């Protein structure tokens, strides 16, 4: 690879996958109320447990200076850069990366492309993974950019939060809305729009209806024949995926990579979340020669039996109005 792909830990790919794909990753810190970074020392499960005990966590944003320092490292080596960022509709990291790109290009004769994923969580992870895999398998700089254009446009997300107390405790919904929603078992179905912003798409009562609604929404928005994998996601309760996997199988999907939500999203919405990411169209044939390893070093799951490690992260719910 004559260029470097840079992303950040909000894509939530596990360390083994990152190492295999030779991706450069910015670390987003997850700090407790005392400012201590716990993302290195605690597993997702341990952080979920702390949250249920009443602890709160915050996440950081990658600064202009951090991007500049990282870019300079590769610029000094003469290495071209493709930098993927969390959606500009959710975070200021894209703007910070663009400012750093401008300064680097004034000093060094290298190519720097900043790609706004317009995605969050598993969608961002999916984009990062396929781009890294293509580069690992010999795709050129321009071919990876071409693939990224497709992935950014076709990546879709559907998810729900089934306990709003964490959104309330984080100041993102009112006490009244959280109480009413939990008492009446009302679940918000959330998606990410074309500008990379999270929005309330539907409201349903109960998990069973949420599974059905997610499938209906997916059916409306995809022309995929099911040959590309779907990425179901969960946090603290893996059992929530059983009905989701079954409904996907009933629709002809048989390739799944079940993913654990990372701690960064949990800092904003809590551990009570599930959903999926998918492509609205099949991956074009011209890219598939670079994606023959699909799910590098990981298993394709036909049944919900074993689950790959974390791949999914960061939904910034600031200013999100659920109702």
Descriptions of predicted regions:
Residues 7, 85, 234:
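Short beta-strand/turn micro-motifs composed of small residues
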Residues 66-97:
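N-terminal glycine-rich phosphate/adenylate-binding segment common to multiple enzyme folds
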């Amino acid at each position: 690879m004559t260029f470097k792909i840079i992303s950040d830990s909000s894509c939530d790919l596990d360390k083994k996958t990152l190492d295999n794909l030779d991706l450069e990753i910015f670390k987003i810190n997850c700090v407790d109320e005392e400012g201590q970074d716990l993302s290195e020392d605690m597993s997702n499960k341990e952080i979920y447990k702390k949250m249920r005990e009443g602890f709160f966590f915050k996440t950081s944003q990658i600064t202009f200076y951090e991007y500049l320092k990282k870019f300079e490292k590769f610029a000094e080596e003469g290495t071209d850069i493709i930098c993927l960022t969390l959606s500009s509709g959710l975070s200021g990291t894209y703007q910070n990366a663009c400012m750093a790109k401008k300064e680097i290009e004034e000093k060094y004769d290298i190519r720097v492309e900043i790609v706004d994923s317009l995605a969050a969580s598993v969608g961002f992870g999916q984009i990062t993974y396929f781009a890294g895999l293509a580069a690992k398998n010999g795709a050129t700089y321009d071919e990876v950019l071409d693939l990224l254009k497709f992935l950014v446009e076709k990546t879709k997300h559907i998810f729900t939060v089934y306990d709003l107390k964490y959104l309330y405790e984080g100041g993102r919904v009112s006490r009244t809305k959280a109480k009413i929603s939990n008492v009446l078992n009302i679940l918000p179905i959330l998606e990410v729009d074309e500008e990379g912003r999270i929005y309330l798409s539907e409201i349903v009562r109960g998990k069973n209806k949420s599974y059905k609604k997610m499938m209906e929404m997916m059916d409306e928005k995809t022309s995929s024949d099911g040959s590309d994998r779907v990425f179901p996601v969960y946090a603290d309760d893996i059992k929530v995926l059983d009905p989701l996997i079954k409904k996907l199988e009933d629709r002809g999907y048989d390739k799944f990579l079940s993913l654990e939500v990372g701690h960064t999203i949990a800092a904003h919405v809590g551990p009570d979340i599930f959903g999926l990411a998918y492509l609205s169209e099949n991956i074009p044939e011209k890219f598939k020669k670079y994606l023959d390893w699909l799910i590098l070093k990981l298993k394709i799951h036909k049944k919900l039996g074993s689950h790959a490690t974390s791949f999914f992260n960061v939904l910034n719910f600031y200013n999100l109005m659920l109702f």
